[in-house]
Amino acid sequence: DNADFRWGICLALNIDEISMNTFSGAGRAAPIPLMNNTQFLQETYTIPMQDWLENFELDLGDGTTFKPYDTGYAKRMADSLGIEGTDEELITMFGAGWWKHDEEAATKLLEKAGLEKVNGVWNYEGKPFTFEMSYLADTEFQEARGVQAAYNQLTKFGFQCSIASKSSATWDVDGGKGNYQIAGYWPSGGILKDFYSAISGFDGDLIKPLGETGSGQGLRWNNEKVTEILHELANTDPESDR
């Protein structure tokens, strides 16, 4: 549970290549990975957050900071696919932004998290740092291709990781209990105006320890402010403008 490690992994990945491998470039990037990035969700939340996202900074641990948000993704994908359009049209097609691919920043963050690259291999406490990446074997085939592309990139970047496919039944158990390390699967709920049911699992009062079936979100991300908001939403009329 280390934010520097997670950001290091994120910045080590090249979303352009992953998108080409997953959707042949036709996917809409979702910088806030809670739900599927529908046009409604993007226009209601992501686009109004652009200033905040563009000014968001990471502490690299060496006295410098880094702004990880990348607004150039839509234009790059359009250029690579030979698609023309206004900025607004390209954002509708490809998304408002994603996170930068920057191996130098990724390296600093991983070192800040306690890892060290030895002879091209990432080590932790003197041993190669290993983890498993998993995806669903019998459904969500685009997501499987995305995980496979990410696995190839992280292996090239120096991680001795493994990759595994799981049945939906196995993932239902493992996801609920937190029995995974890095996993790829589709979120849902972004098409709904009232998506409380899709995010209610982030209520800190419902989160269970690892090994116990959790509240509906395998991340076990616990934030006091979010819990307060969810408690308020639980008692808000779905037809309310709020």
Where does each model-flagged region fall?
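Paired acidic/hydrophobic, glycine-rich loop segments that form the ligand-binding mouth/hinge
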Residues: 181-186
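Append "and occasionally in soluble cytosolic enzymes with long acidic Gly/Pro-rich linkers
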Residues: 2-152
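Extracytoplasmic/peripheral linker and loop segments enriched in polar/acidic and small residues
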Residues: 6, 19-22, 56-92, 99, ...
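Short secondary-structure boundary/capping segments
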Residues: 25-26, 36, 179-180, 198-202
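Short, solvent-exposed loop/turn segments at the edges of secondary structure
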Residues: 1-3, 29, 126, 177-178, ...
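Short helices/loops that flank or line small-molecule/ion binding pockets
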Residues: 3-4, 148-157, 169-180
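A ligand-binding cleft/hinge motif common to bilobed small-molecule-binding domains
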Residues: 189-194
